[in-house]
A protein has these predicted regions:
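Short amphipathic alpha-helical interaction segments
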Residues: 30-45
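Amphipathic alpha-helical dimerization/coiled-coil segments
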Residues: 73-84
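Basic, amphipathic "hinge/linker" alpha-helix immediately C-terminal to the N-terminal HTH DNA-binding motif
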Residues: 56-71
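Short capping segments at the starts of secondary-structure elements
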Residues: 15-21
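Short alpha-helical segments that sit at the start of domains
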Residues: 1-10
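A short, conserved structural fragment
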Residues: 44-53
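A short acidic, leucine-rich amphipathic alpha-helix
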Residues: 24-28
């Protein structure tokens, strides 16, 4: 099953909710190191994820949580429409 970039971003934001390491995100979302590195770079640049140098962890920001909430709402709506 191919995932869209939007789905991958949502999975990363969900995995980083509460704070976690790059390795845990990589395994939870099933991405290669280079793929994850590219996504994290974009998400950090857009203030959707923040990186904590001291603990070497990533955490979804308030903006990222809002994006995730919108994504989940749209996915639910599309699922309802598809089942009508």
């Amino acid at each position: 099953m191919n995932r869209s970039r939007t789905e991958i971003v949502a999975m990363i934001l969900d995995a980083a909710n509460g704070g976690t390491t790059k390795t845990k995100i990589m395994y939870n979302v099933m991405l290669t190191y280079n793929q994850l590195k590219n996504y994290l770079s974009i998400l950090i640049e857009n203030n959707s994820i923040e990186y904590f140098e001291g603990t070497k962890t990533f955490k979804t920001t308030e903006k990222g949580l809002n994006l995730l909430k919108i994504h989940n709402g749209m996915a639910e709506l599309l699922h309802i429409i598809a089942n009508d």
